[in-house]
Amino acid sequence: MPILRSATSTQGRNMAGARALWRATGMKENDFGKPIIAVVNSFTQFVPGHVHLRDMGKLVAEQIEAAGGVAKEFNTIAVDDGIAMGHGGMLYSLPSRDLIADSVEYMVNAHCADAMVCISNCDKITPGMLMAAMRLNIPAVFVSGGPMEAGKTKLSDQLIKLDLVDAMMKSADKTVCDDDVDAIEKSACPTCGSCSGMFTANSMNCLTEALGLSLPGNGSMLATHADRKELFLTAGRQIVELCKRYYEQDDASVLPRSIATKAAFENAMSLDIAMGGSTNTVLHLLAAAQEAEVDFTMADIDRLSRKVPCLSKVAPNTNKYHMEDVHRAGGIMAILGELERADLLHSDTRTVLGMTIGEQIAKYDITLTKDEAVHKFFRAGPAGIRTTKAFSQDCRWDTVDDDRQNGCIRSKEFAYSQDGGLAMLTGNIALDGCIVKTAGVDESILKFTGDAIVFESQEEAVEGILGGKVRAGHVVIIRYEGPKGGPGMQEMLYPTTYLKSIGLGKECALLTDGRFSGGTSGLSIGHCSPEAASGGTIGLVRDGDKIAIDIPNRSIQLLVSDEELAVRRAEQDTKGWKPANRQREVSMALKMFGHFATSADKGAVRDKTKL
């Protein structure tokens, strides 16, 4: 029978000093012997996805205390990728993921916490906490802040839905007048919450449902809706139940590694492919799997991508639907239900509610249940009122969207495409693979051959795109932006956005060893591995080289002979694998990250051979 970890600091005469300090935090005599549960919050006023989380920890803590636990809250950092985008701040985004994982480990292990509730929301915070949960393997429940409502404004007397990417793209489009840009900027992000499309933050919060570590509705229920409050209350109660099952009943099935098995990781990846989620999720799932000691690799992702169809298209892959529409269509339980009926889901994986994922689908899939409470839950919709307050409205759609032929979520029979929303490509330029979000690629360019135009940094690429150097038919190469080469593996949202803004979104491809924002669409191929700084072939490309991309056949080839590549490699070995003429100030913290980082095909985690 496992004993409470917290007993290390609360039991025995020799812990009188520690108990004295615990008492100074507010603990009473009868609290010693109860499970101490870390409430891992990430409130910050820097990030709209986290600006409303200040009071969420208190909600969770009250339920923990009422159920017989002791709640102790602490905060992690949180970087806003959108605000950090397009300048040196983006170098810090991915490294913050690992820093968050470490900080959670430090706090939980230093204070011998017995379990944790992870209150996350945005791009690197959920993955960082997920890595920590897998590493620590103590009872854990995830509950996120929820998605932002989609922006809405009138342009040319037509009501349109908006998000962050629209503001970025229109500002770079010289045909859009200043008044329209101003209207879009002021309407694109109307409420608290993670940005309203299927970008990285929302993708990751959806994947925690598929992994079994969060509650139904976690990924799709709006941050502003009153119904979301119940997710926090339930998380507080449920974590105490998980503690009892583990520490009092010796039931290890409630631990994160028992829930997030390889089958669960496959479920999460299948969901990601089916909903056309962010390519960043590949990076984060690979990293979390390594922390969980689960053998889940790019080969598994490739296998799944060849059989899972695209069942949902949401911004940025379409302007028609945002996360509020996914929720109306039944949320993640509905997509998982369609995967289950297509025999593309492991239905026997477990969840933090103590059910199998199959049992959870039966209870919460709106096409299977007549339960009015469930249907009411998924009718929760936007209010259209600017606010930074959680639970500030209780508006509802008149009906759910259960149209699986033409609605937001489709059945396999009526899928947006039988080919999934994400694909892994391999070839001589990406021996260990690269990733493309196929849900955002126009059918006309699923096969594309063009001339390379090479840039040694994101900044140089942006200058080249806006300066007219990039033309139709080019394959834009942005290299030395990988985990090592950046260092930090920047997102390339500005280059892809600017290509669209000048009318080249369907006329060019982009290949990088960096990564993309979840807001990216188009023929944008990232995570090229090995990266240039690790001697990857992308570092050998020269202007004018032909590159052939074939998404249906999962191939990407640099059309240069092996003999020529061998000559170039010998020359580059002599010069060193570093960018030519790039001026970039790199801090000691970033140098440390780059020194230990692996390439993207390994999740950009630390290279343990260097420890």
From Swiss-Prot:
Cofactor(s) required for function per UniProt: [2Fe-2S] cluster; Mg(2+)
Modified residue annotations for N6-carboxylysine: 124
InterPro entries to which the protein is assigned, alphabetical: Dihydro-acid_dehy_C, DihydroxyA_deHydtase, DiOHA_6PGluconate_deHydtase_CS, ILV_EDD_C, ILV_EDD_N, IlvD/EDD_N
A Pfam family recorded for this sequence: ILV_EDD_C
Residues at the catalytic site: 517 (proton acceptor)
EC number: 4.2.1.9
Protein residues bound to Mg(2+): 81, 123-124, 491
Record field: catalytic activity: (2R)-2,3-dihydroxy-3-methylbutanoate = 3-methyl-2-oxobutanoate + H2O; (2R,3R)-2,3-dihydroxy-3-methylpentanoate = (S)-3-methyl-2-oxopentanoate + H2O
Keywords, comma-separated and alphabetical: 2Fe-2S, Amino-acid biosynthesis, Branched-chain amino acid biosynthesis, Iron, Iron-sulfur, Lyase, Magnesium, Metal-binding
Cofactor note: Binds 1 [2Fe-2S] cluster per subunit. This cluster acts as a Lewis acid cofactor.
Enzyme class: lyase
Binding of [2Fe-2S] cluster, residues: 122, 195
Any single GO CC term annotated in Swiss-Prot or TrEMBL for this entry: cytosol
Recorded superkingdom: Bacteria
Gene3D superfamilies associated with the record: IlvD/EDD C-terminal domain-like
Gene Ontology biological process terms in this record: isoleucine biosynthetic process; L-valine biosynthetic process
Pathway(s) the chain acts in: Amino-acid biosynthesis; L-isoleucine biosynthesis; L-isoleucine from 2-oxobutanoate: step 3/4; Amino-acid biosynthesis; L-valine biosynthesis; L-valine from pyruvate: step 3/4
Annotated GO MF terms: 2 iron, 2 sulfur cluster binding; dihydroxy-acid dehydratase activity; magnesium ion binding
Self-association and partners: Homodimer.
Function: Functions in the biosynthesis of branched-chain amino acids. Catalyzes the dehydration of (2R,3R)-2,3-dihydroxy-3-methylpentanoate (2,3-dihydroxy-3-methylvalerate) into 2-oxo-3-methylpentanoate (2-oxo-3-methylvalerate) and of (2R)-2,3-dihydroxy-3-methylbutanoate (2,3-dihydroxyisovalerate) into 2-oxo-3-methylbutanoate (2-oxoisovalerate), the penultimate precursor to L-isoleucine and L-valine, respectively.
NCBIfam families associated with the record: ilvD, PRK12448.1
Sequence similarity: Belongs to the IlvD/Edd family.
HAMAP family documented for this protein: IlvD
Protein name: Dihydroxy-acid dehydratase
Species whose genome carries this gene: Actinobacillus pleuropneumoniae serotype 5b (strain L20)
Native organism taxonomy: Bacteria, Pseudomonadati, Pseudomonadota, Gammaproteobacteria, Pasteurellales
Annotated gene: ilvD
